[in-house]
UniProtKB/Swiss-Prot annotation:
Annotated function: Transfers the gamma-phosphate of ATP to the 4'-position of a tetraacyldisaccharide 1-phosphate intermediate (termed DS-1-P) to form tetraacyldisaccharide 1,4'-bis-phosphate (lipid IVA).
Chain sites annotated for binding ATP: T68, V69, G70, G71, T72, G73, K74, T75
UniProt protein name: Tetraacyldisaccharide 4'-kinase
Domain of life from the UniProt record: Bacteria
GO BP, sorted A to Z: lipid A biosynthetic process; lipopolysaccharide core region biosynthetic process
HAMAP family: LpxK
Underlying gene: lpxK
NCBIfam families cross-referenced by the UniProt entry: lpxK (TIGR00682)
Pathway it works in: Glycolipid biosynthesis; lipid IV(A) biosynthesis; lipid IV(A) from (3R)-3-hydroxytetradecanoyl-[acyl-carrier-protein] and UDP-N-acetyl-alpha-D-glucosamine: step 6/6
MF term (GO), any: ATP binding
Reactions this protein catalyses: a lipid A disaccharide + ATP = a lipid IVA + ADP + H(+)
First and last residue of the signal peptide: none
Length: 342
């Protein structure tokens, strides 16, 4: 990893730590947070009052998003939700912004797409679910293009986009991890994009450290469970995580909350060395060349960015499955069958 990449990763870690407490750093930024909150409130009000019109794309929309900055487990939640909706008789499609990709117009994502042209999360969703996936910074345009290409799709899941109010939605699901709302301040003084009091249909909390849920209405536990690791060069070759226990292991993650990935591996009985990479790390070169380890465990989100040129036999990919509460699935299905987009 380059010096700039290492500096960025350390900066992300430092800011995230500061956002967990009401430090002098956070208080100094509260005037900017107030300005940010005012702008966000005006934008919400414009759509709530009808001054700006949300666009109904013709089918129900479920938005899976967050009110905080950083990774909370949205992507595995979207994958699990698509599978659950399909099991309930729906034909789901997925739209996403395509963060990190050079996308300006609606673009279809297939399992054969490149991460640079699709975005790492949309590509992972396409590969894991087989559902139609379209990306565009304008999610309305992405949804309309998806429907035109796949008229059988009867529900759209939006990967993120909670603040993309122009896209009318039927259900809003907000995902938190163990950090919840951090220090409770809005950006840039804290991690919140919107107040914790923001309306949503349900809240999911992914907390590997505690089984307790916050006292919020319609709140459900979100369990993320690692599966057997698969070899990057030979995907059919799989090993239970327990088999790595007596090896020199490096865990690396270029995701929004790398420590959560490391905690998952520790909970599985491993004691790896760890390396936090910047979120959406591009892997322009191999940052592991000088690491004297037997195995390197990475996330699925990082794996989709590594092409055939990566010939490091030490690389293993750890898949993660999200277990959704059956009551949450029932709530979503009921709302989809009983309400139109608004």
């Amino acid at each position: 990893m380059s010096a700039a990449g290492g500096l960025l990763a350390r900066l992300e870690t430092r800011v995230t730590r500061e956002w967990q407490r009401r430090s002098a750093f956070a208080w100094a930024l509260t005037p900017f947070a107030c300005a940010f909150g005012l702008c966000a409130a005006l934008r919400r009000t414009a759509y709530a009052r009808g001054w700006k019109q949300a666009v109904d794309v013709g089918v129900p929309v479920v938005v899976v998003g967050n009110v905080t900055v950083g990774g909370t487990g949205k992507t595995p939640t979207v994958i699990a939700l698509v599978d659950a909706l399909r099991a309930a008789g729906f034909t789901p499609g997925v739209v996403s912004r395509g963060y990190g990709a050079n996308v300006k117009t609606p673009t279809a994502v297939t399992p054969a797409s490149r991460a640079g042209a699709a975005g790492d999360e949309p590509l992972l969703i396409a590969r894991r679910t087989g559902a139609p996936v379209w990306v565009c910074p304008d999610r309305v345009a992405a949804a309309q293009a998806l429907r035109a290409a796949h008229p059988d799709v009867d529900v759209i899941v939006s990967d993120d986009g909670l603040q993309h109010y122009r896209l009318a939605r039927t259900v809003e699901l907000v995902v938190f991890d163990h950090r919840l709302g951090g220090n409770g301040f809005l950006l840039p003084a804290g991690p919140l994009r919107e107040p914790l009091s923001r309306h949503r249909d349900a809240t999911l909390v992914n907390d590997p450290y505690s089984g307790a849920l916050p006292p919020w209405p319609d709140t459900y536990s979100l369990a993320l469970t690692p599966g057997a690791a698969w070899h990057l060069d030979q995907p059919t070759l799989r090993r239970p995580l327990s088999q790595f226990a007596n090896e020199r292991v490096l865990a690396a993650a270029g995701i929004g909350a790398p420590e959560r990935f490391f905690a998952t591996l520790r909970a599985a009985g491993l004691a790896p060395a760890t390396r936090a990479l910047p979120d959406h790390y591009a892997f322009a070169d191999n940052p592991f060349v000088d690491d004297a380890v037997d195995a390197i465990l990475i996330t699925e989100k990082d794996a989709v960015k590594l092409g055939a040129s990566w010939r490091d036999a030490r690389l293993w990919v750890v898949p993660v499955e999200a277990a959704l509460d059956p009551r949450l699935i029932a709530l979503v299905v009921e709302k989809l069958r009983g309400r139109s987009p608004a």
